[in-house]
Structures are given as C-alpha cells and as structure tokens.
C-alpha cells in the first residue's frame, strides 16, 4: 500500500509546491501542446516521499509484511492465538493464546505466519513497547505448558514485554508446575520474562479486566469471526485503493504523453477514447468509496446497537484507517476531476481548433476558386442581350457563392468567439479570422466591380441599341414613304413633317458626342466594343445624312409646287429611268412580299413589300436597300440567338431538375422500380448536346452577331458535332417507351412541381428533335436576305448539310427498325437512300410460272441502299402510340453492289427501273412512287457504281505501274489492235493469279502512238479485277436489244457519229492534242488510229486528238435501254477497253 500513499502524499506535496516561483515560471507554450499534471495529480510512485507518512498508518507496512488475512484465513480460523484489542497498563498490545489442546500439532509454518501477521497489525509505536502474551493452560499439563512457552519464546517475531501463563488448575499438575518452574526459572528468564499465574484474579493484577476477554474473566467484547471478517474487508479495501491508484497513475501517464492530433477525426477519436477511460476510472473510484463506506458502517455497527458498548483500541484503529483511506480517496477523486477537467478542456479546444482549421481550408479553397472565376469574367458583352445574360449569370453566380461567403463570415465569428473564450491557440486563430474577413471583402468588392462594369456595359449597349433602333426606324420610315404621293404639295409637306418629327427624336435616341462616350465608358471599351461603337455611330451619321438628303429633296418638291406647273413633254431619259408600274408587277411585288412572313413581324413585311415595288420615282439608293436587308438579317440572327439561349436554358433545366435528381438520395423513394438505373435511356445523350451548345455553338453564334450573313460558317465548322443528334434520335423510341411506362411516377410530378413547369418532361425531351429541324428554317430565312452577301455560299452549303443530317437521322430511324438481318449493318457502309417501292422479280433460270406471276403481282418492299449492298425488306405496320407506332422492317434479301447493274428505263414507264444481278441472272423491276424518286435513286446508284469503277481503275493502274517496272515487255509482233488485244487477253487468262494491267500489254503490242497522243496515254486502263472478285467488269454497257446482251462478239470500239461527253481530265501532250476537262461536250470529226479520235469542243470550238476511251456517248432517241453495271459475265472487249461509268441523258445528234 506504500505506493498508494506515496501517490497521495506526492499529490499533496505538489499542491504545497504549486505556488513556488519555479512553477509560476513554467512555459505557457508547453502547456498549449501537452497535458500538464503538475498542478493536478502525480501518479509516479516515489519511495523517498513515502517516509512522509504518519507512523500510525498501518496500511503502509503491507509492502514489508505481505501477509494478509485472506492469505492465512484458514490458519487464523483455528484461533490458537488472537489479538483481542486489549492493552496493558503502558499500552502494550495483548496477544492471547487460549486453551488449544492440539497446539503442539500446529505446523511451524502456520504458527510463524499467524505470529507474524498478528504482530504486524498494531502500529509501530505500540509494537515498539512490546507485546504481552497471555497463555491460558489451565486445562493442560505442565509438559505442554513448558513446550508452548518455549515454542512461543523461540518463534515470536516481535518484542516481548511480558509472558503471563495461567498454569494448570489440577492439584497434581499445579504442584508439578510449581516444582518444575522453580528448578527451571533460570531457563525461562533467559528467554522471556514469564509469570506463572495460578488464577484469573491474579491475572487481573497485571492486566485490567476491561482489556481481557470474557473467558479470562474480563469484560472486553471480542468475536473472533467478526474480527477476521473486518480484517479481511479492511485489507481488501486497502488493496482496492492501491489498484485504483495504480490505474490512475497509468491513465495519468497516458494522458500526459498524448500528443494533440492534427485532424478532426483523430481528435474526436482521442477525446472519445479518453472520455470512455475516464468514465471507467471514475466507476472504479466510486466502487472503492462505496466499499470503504460499507466497511466503516460495519465497524461502527456494534456501537450503534448498544450505547454502553466499549470499543477497544484495535477497533478504533481500524475505523481510523478506513476513514483515512476514504478521505484520501475523496481527495484523489477531487484532484483527478480537476486534472481531467483541464485535460478535457484541452482536447475540446483542440477539437474546436481542428474544426475551425478544416472549415478554414474548405472556405478558403471555395473563396479562392470563386475569386479566380470572378477574375476570369472579363467579358463585357457584345450586345444588349448578351450583357443582360452576363448580368443574370453574375447574379446566379453571386447567389451560389453567397453560401460560401456566409459560411466564411460565420466561421470568422466562430473564431472570434474562441478567442474570447481564451482558447490556447489564439495566435493561430486570430490570423485566420483576419484572412477570412479579407477574402470575403475582396470577393464582395470584385463582384461589385464586375457588376459595375456590366452595368456600364448595359448602359452603353442600351445607348447603342437605342441608336441602332432609331437608325432602323429611320430607314423603315424612308423606305415606307411612297414617292408618288410626295409629288404633290400636300404629300411632300406631310412627308417632310414626318422627316422633321423623326429628326426631333434624335436628341433622345442617338449618340451625341463620340468623344464623350469614349471618356465615360473607357473602363469597358475593348477593341471589339470600340469598333461596334464606331459602326453604330457611322450608321447613325449615315442615317442622318439620308434624312437630310430626303429632307432637302422634299423641301424642293414642296417649294416647286408653290408655282404653276407648265405642262411639258416627258423626256425619254426620264421614261426609261422611271417606268410606270404595271398591275402585274404590283401584284408580283405583293406576292413577293407575302413570302417574308417567316419572321411574323408586320412592319418588316410592310418594309419588304415596299422595297420590292418597282422603283418609279424613288430616290432611295442601293445603300438603303442593303440597310433594309441588313436589318432583316439582324432580326433573323436575333431570333436564332434568342431561341438558342432559350434552348440551352431548357436543356440545363431538364438536366438539373430531372436527370440530376435521379441520383439524389432524398428523391430515391419517389423513383419507381421500372425507372431505376435507366437515366441514360430516358435522357439519352442530352448532356452531350447541352455541353456542345452551351460551351461551343452558342458562343460561336454570338460572335456572328455583327455579321449575321457569316453564320453559315458556324454551322459548317461544327457539322461533325451535329451528328450527336442522330444518336439522340435513335434512342428516342426507347426513351418514349420508358416515359409512357413511368409517366405517372411521383418523381416526375415532384420535379415538375419544383421547377414550376406547366409542361411535363416528355415535352422537354422532344426539344432536341425540334431544335435540329428549326435550324434549316432559320438558315433558309437568312439565305433569303443574303443572296448577294459574302457568306451566301456558306449559308447554302450549311443549309444543305443540315438537311443532309435530317435525312441521315430519318434514315437511321428506319434502319434501326430492321429485324431479321444476321450481319452487322455497319459493315454495309453508309446508308444512302431508303424508301418503299413495288417490286417484280424475274429470274433467268426460274420456272415459267414464277416469271408470269411476277409480271402481274408486285411485291411491296422497302429498299435500303448502302454503299456496299442494297437490302430488300418487308414493311410491317405496328400498333401503338408515338414511336411504338413506327413501322418495322423484316429483312428478305440483299444484293452486293459489286455485282449489281441498273437499267434506267423499262418499257417507257417513267417510274420504273431495273436492278439486275450477276449479269441478269436475277432481275428486279422497281416502280417508284414518283418519277422524281426514281431519278434520285438511279442517280445515287450510278454514283455508287461509278465510285466502284474509279476505285478499280486506280487499283488496276497501280498494279500495272508496279508490274511494268518488274516485268520485261514483249516486242510487238503485229500492228493490229485487235490481234494484240486478243493475244494479251490470252496471256491474262493464262495467268489468272497474277493479272497484268492492260495498259502495259497494249502499249507493248501496238505501234507507238503519234506525238499528239502523249497527253492521253494514261487513260487506257484494264479493269480486270482479282480472282475473288468474280471478274469485275465495266460499269457501263450499251445494248440495242436483249440479244446483244448475250452476244459473244468482241472487237474494238467503233466510231458512232454524234456528240460525246468527256469522262476524265486530260492535259495537252502535243500540238495536235486537245486539253479537256471532265464534263465537257465534244463532237467527233474523224476517227484516227491507235484508239484516238479527232474531236471539236462545242464550247470553245477548239479541235484536237483525244483517246476514244475517255468519251461517253450521248444517244439520241432510241428504244434501247441504258444499263449501268458493275459486275457480270462480260466480254473481252469490255475487259480490254472498259466503257466509261457515267451515262448522261440521251441527246439527239
């Protein structure tokens, strides 16, 4: 127990020393970063300080005598010796040895343990006086008496003052003891002072009766079992106090050595762990105090039961010991509570500091990011609408940023509160509070500065807009004044009043001083805005100049009418300059003006109608017309920009109000099972469309606000990005089907309610489809007013491209509806055309019955023309709503385009054409709904076959060029082109696996062409394909009858008089050759040798020699059909000299 009390006295000494000067000089900085227990509890045991304990503290000596009642409880229960609590006259403790017949049989170890324990109970002061032993042997024999006395004297571990022996009471034994004691007196004196007593009264002469137990004739109340229970409880309590002290010591050391964590989570964990351990320590302290109070009550119980009960000294000592332990425990608890309060406060302040630091980092990052964004907002706008949009964005940005700013200001106030509460880290908190205040003020000032700049820009653009509006209204006024009415005095005066009245409004609407504008708006005038101001001012001056000219003219007219007008004959020049408008022309102007209704603005239609009237007597110049068209272009551009901005905002509204909410955990309970994880199906790639328009396309459109006629370039440069609409439209059927299944979902209703939308989500999902179709209408309007402008060609090309995208989107919607096709439709190349036709089939090797039935009963087929194949499908109508009602297409068959040929006209029917396969083994007669559709399909198929022909020619030429360098050319044996061709064909047939280009063969067998043919030598190609292509033949055949189709004759190309078209470019190779370009029309004059014809260019009238293979016949009226083929069993002549791929419409010679 010495450790426990050492800890207590250390605590008291620390308290007594806490006011020393050394303690007052302790560093405050060290106290800020570690737990200081110097003024609380020292839990480290110190043996030197243990000597400060009082001498009456029995518990301290348990380190010297480790025995306790619990260890020898069974030995003490034998009661062969006990400490009754009695005292001698000088205060010596009395140990009684009652009559115990088996005393001699007690083992020495047990006897030694009991003696050692009993002598350790009294205080050191009482034990120093010496013990009095009372040995009761009245019922024993002398021999036992002697043995007991000698054993006790030999083994007694403490000082002995007196040994009182009650000798045997029997006559014989008493007589024997007297005699024996007399003879052995010296032996007893040598060991201990022994007094042989004959009776109890004699014993009372040495020890007062009140200090003796009842069995010795005394009045001392002693119960051995009660004494043993009390001693066990007191020692157990002392041990509990010791363990509690050790636990406090370990816990205090742990707290003292704990470093303050650097983050919120770790600090919270440390605080929680320490609080939990502190609760456990407090529980153990309370348990010890409860145990001590219970023991004290037990010790006081005999006195409480009887007032006359006397308490011996041992009982008093026990009560004092327990009281002292309880007092020390209470003091220890109080000291620990004080120490814990400081430690807990330190940890709580540390946690507050970490929360503050974490919040500071987050807020500072947010404020820095917002400051960077506001610093990057340098755009002051290029139009009034743009500035208003920027101001709206700034307001939205400020509203979103207000959360971070409010959080920063609240955090700064929180830091000030910590400082006021005397936080230990004031030096760290105060600078951060100042920095937060500075960041908030800086951000607020930047927002204010930005708002002031935009307000200035808004003010300037309002002035510019007002000026432009004034100029536009002036131009409209000038354009709307009918010149014929101004010829009269009243009309001229009325027009003059309108002019003067309008000029009076200029003081309020026009820019007065340009220098003043420069000076007042210097802070926002960048190069673009400066140029815009100058343009507006120039336009204003130009308008004023036109008004002054009109005003001067009207004044002259009004002044001339004041004198009589002499009738004179009109001058011819005046008649030619100002013809009278005819009723037809007037109606024409009215009709043309009605075409401008796309913008749906009455004044614009009126201005356009007036401008389109005949120019009789009008004084407005071409510049005025251009200004009027420019105004119309500007209005189209404004409509394009306004609708584009609204479109972008609607997309953002859908993405934030619906798509993002599908990932919101708070809305998850509203989403039905059928809608979960299907956001991509419902919204498709709308987010991709939004980012394209918001980040790229809208900005590029805004850059064209001053030059609306150049907007076509924006569309052309971003035409590839517009392909994303095809993906969206392809997903639209799935999206609409999902919407119909889940349209009544509470999620959609809640989102619509939050957004305050009058229309449901499906209306907004249709916006991208509507928008892509809207562009072509706006481009048409812009093109109508920009026909003679710089960007007219770009507008036309952009319109064609947008229409192409719409067609591709429409075609792809049909394409995804094809069912039953085993292959990959993507491998067939780009989809070129699709449509429904009536189809008859005719097979060369089929049964006659099938042929005849096919003539009368057509099949309804939907054809899909790809670059590599044409697909025949059966259209099936579906029942349902929306996209579910769209038809599906069952795949029937397909034809490879490498083996397809066409016949343009069938039996004089303008709506029919043939597609035949494998040299007419299979023939399909196609009837289009209209001749125009037939022409479009024939042209598209012709383009595909021509491109295949060109690709084969290039490949053949490339192979010939490689082989001409590696193989020796044979010496020509004949000058006949036919024989040479036949010989070379045979050689090619002999070498199927390695075909040679015809150019090399023919050039080696034919005589050298004249000098004038050098420029056209590259046009003689072989069209023989690799073996796996199945003998790819010419893409064009000219036939006069069906018999000619199967004719096996071969020969060189014969001259047919008439006109021809040039298929490929040719440079001038000599003085007699003719340089031609593809598409030129020529007339054959003379047939030459070696494949050259002498022709005349019908355009330039120049003449010269050209290769016959580079010309295509323009036929006259004939019943023979024109066929275009890319495959089939072809003749040698066509293989040797392939015919051109492109056939134009027949033209008579």
From Swiss-Prot:
InterPro entries: CRAL-TRIO_dom, CRAL-TRIO_dom_sf, DBL_dom_sf, DBS_PH, DBS_SH3, DH_dom, GDS_CDC24_CS, PH-like_dom_sf. Residues 830-946 form the PH domain. It is a peripheral membrane protein. Residues 583-594, 964-978 have a biased composition (Low complexity). One of its GO terms (molecular function) is 1-phosphatidylinositol binding. Residues 607-616 have a biased composition (Basic and acidic residues). Keywords: Cell membrane, Coiled coil, Cytoplasm, Guanine-nucleotide releasing factor, Lipid-binding, Membrane, Phosphoprotein, Proto-oncogene, SH3 domain. It is found in: Cytoplasm; Cell membrane. GO terms for cellular component: cytoplasm; lamellipodium; membrane; plasma membrane. Its main location: cytoplasm. Residues 503-528 form a coiled coil. PANTHER family: GUANINE NUCLEOTIDE EXCHANGE FACTOR DBS, RHO GUANINE EXCHANGE FACTOR-RELATED. The CRAL-TRIO domain mediates interaction with various inositol phospholipids, such as phosphatidylinositol 3-phosphate (PI3P), phosphatidylinositol 4-phosphate (PI4P) and phosphatidylinositol 5-phosphate (PI5P). The DH domain is involved in interaction with CCPG1. Guanine nucleotide exchange factor that catalyzes guanine nucleotide exchange on RHOA and CDC42, and thereby contributes to the regulation of RHOA and CDC42 signaling pathways. Seems to lack activity with RAC1. Becomes activated and highly tumorigenic by truncation of the N-terminus. This is Guanine nucleotide exchange factor DBS. It comes from Rattus norvegicus (Rat). The gene is Mcf2l.
